[in-house]
């Protein structure tokens, strides 16, 4: 259920400041969004996977906290990030 190395590298290259920038809020939010989207497809097929759903909710909560932090510290990057990821807010 995790992302491939190539997919992670592509996300880091798209949202990071350089190729090794994995710690910035924008990159972390983009990686979590990709994982969440992948898991949503999984739960469409496996409706009774409650243990996995708990992990999904944990990821959504972590993404929400990172988005709140980004909004508090840099509103322009927050707006750009949610627009690029297609998140509603």
Curated annotation (Swiss-Prot):
Tell me a GO biological process for this protein: translation
- Coiled-coil segments on the chain, per record: none
Identify the keywords attached in UniProt to this record, alphabetized: Ribonucleoprotein, Ribosomal protein, RNA-binding, rRNA-binding
| Xref: CDD domains | Ribosomal_S15p_S13e
Q: Which InterPro entries does the record cross-reference, listed alphabetically?
A: Ribosomal_uS15, Ribosomal_uS15_bac-type, uS15_NS1_RNA-bd_sf
Q: Which GO terms describe its molecular function?
A: rRNA binding; structural constituent of ribosome
Task: Supply the PANTHER family for this chain.
Answer: RIBOSOMAL PROTEIN S15, BACTERIAL AND ORGANELLAR (PTHR23321), SMALL RIBOSOMAL SUBUNIT PROTEIN US15M (PTHR23321:SF26)
Fill in the subunit field for this protein.
Part of the 30S ribosomal subunit. Forms a bridge to the 50S subunit in the 70S ribosome, contacting the 23S rRNA.
Query: Which family is this protein grouped under?
Result: Belongs to the universal ribosomal protein uS15 family.
What is the name of the protein in this document?
Small ribosomal subunit protein uS15
* Annotated source species: Mannheimia succiniciproducens (strain KCTC 0769BP / MBEL55E)
């Amino acid at each position: 259920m995790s992302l491939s190395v190539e997919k992670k590298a592509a996300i880091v290259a798209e949202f990071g400041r350089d190729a090794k920038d994995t710690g910035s809020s924008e990159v972390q939010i983009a990686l979590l969004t990709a994982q969440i989207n992948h898991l949503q497809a999984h739960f469409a097929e496996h409706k009774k996977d409650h243990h996995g759903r708990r992990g999904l909710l944990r990821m959504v909560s972590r993404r929400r906290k990172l988005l709140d932090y980004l909004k508090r510290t840099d509103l322009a990057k927050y707006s750009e990030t949610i627009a690029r990821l297609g998140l509603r807010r």
